[in-house]
């Protein structure tokens, strides 16, 4: 139930009798819309590959539903947890993630998939450490900006400290390698620093360093050079380095205005690699057409607008950790979704990033559910603080 009639007194000692909304209905609606579309499209896009490797068509759908169930259970806990708890554990959590990033690089411990060692195998479950690191980085930076706001804005030394952490995390991610996660984390950190009021000369200096470093890394690996070349002209090598992108573009072309119909994709029949993960958006374009694309973009836009509004409201209430956290989480989701859609449409080089709340993936789905729960919790605290009431806790 989204509304209730509080029986508490406000800060002036007067009873509050009018119903208030516990959580943001627009945000909840957008999220559940994306989750429903995601389950439908994972079911559709993975039928052939599930049948080929597991001899039953809904293997990936069942697993995705299980991941979503776990994510929602954890979200119920997070949404009842005070945001100050995450501020207290932000530093230990960051240190723990750096340790896990080191552990995942050890052969025999880290699980290698498609040439990248990104997963820790915990029995039958693979944990992608980079997803947890994104969350830890936002918590750490939010806490640091609260503690060192003046130093970050006025002193180069205060600015360098979080950059050192970012550099360590980026190096460890690139050793996996996970170029996509590095881009998302770096972009999120830069955006949060900009919102915190860092001097422009520091900010643009950082941007220059980061962009230069990423460009050098991109051209230093033959694998990444091949991806860049394929991005610039995928049809020049459509059966090799440009194969995935050309198949994605074919899916977009087949979709037209209203798509071929749910379940009617041709590209998912093992023509388009990673159709249920990194390139799910292409299958959405093929089966649901431009109309489906616009629906997905609209739902993401609602999510982003509401997330930014939650961050701004927390800032006006001088709840700065909650504000920076809400901004960071929203920027992360917006950036990752934009990059994924851009890659699928041929506007950006391939990065290997999932589409938040839609693509198949255990770690990403669970973490995304936690992210949404954090936004809802901050919004809940905003609403109740504005009335002088104590937020609900577990």
Swiss-Prot record:
Annotated membrane topology: Multi-pass membrane protein
Any GO MF annotation of the entry: peptidoglycan glycosyltransferase activity
Compartments, as annotated in UniProt: Cell inner membrane
EC number, UniProt record: 2.4.99.28
Stretches of the chain found on the membrane's Cytoplasmic side: 1-26, 79-88, 140-154, 199-201, 300-327, 376-394
Gene Ontology cellular component terms for the protein in this record: cell division site; plasma membrane
Gene Ontology terms: biological process: cell wall organization; FtsZ-dependent cytokinesis; peptidoglycan biosynthetic process; regulation of cell shape
Keywords tagged on the record: Cell cycle, Cell division, Cell inner membrane, Cell membrane, Cell shape, Cell wall biogenesis/degradation, Glycosyltransferase, Membrane, Peptidoglycan synthesis, Transferase, Transmembrane, Transmembrane helix
Transmembrane region(s): 27-47, 58-78, 89-109, 119-139, 155-175, 178-198, 202-222, 279-299, 328-348, 355-375
Superkingdom assignment: Bacteria
Periplasmic side: 48-57, 110-118, 176-177, 223-278, 349-354
Pathway recorded for this protein: Cell wall biogenesis; peptidoglycan biosynthesis
Catalytic activities: [GlcNAc-(1->4)-Mur2Ac(oyl-L-Ala-gamma-D-Glu-L-Lys-D-Ala-D-Ala)](n)-di-trans,octa-cis-undecaprenyl diphosphate + beta-D-GlcNAc-(1->4)-Mur2Ac(oyl-L-Ala-gamma-D-Glu-L-Lys-D-Ala-D-Ala)-di-trans,octa-cis-undecaprenyl diphosphate = [GlcNAc-(1->4)-Mur2Ac(oyl-L-Ala-gamma-D-Glu-L-Lys-D-Ala-D-Ala)](n+1)-di-trans,octa-cis-undecaprenyl diphosphate + di-trans,octa-cis-undecaprenyl diphosphate + H(+)
Chief place of localization: membrane
Entries under PANTHER family matching the protein: CELL CYCLE PROTEIN, PEPTIDOGLYCAN GLYCOSYLTRANSFERASE FTSW-RELATED
Its job: Peptidoglycan polymerase that is essential for cell division.
Family as reported in the entry's similarity comment: Belongs to the SEDS family. FtsW subfamily.
Protein name according to UniProt: Probable peptidoglycan glycosyltransferase FtsW
Annotated source species: Legionella pneumophila subsp. pneumophila (strain Philadelphia 1 / ATCC 33152 / DSM 7513)
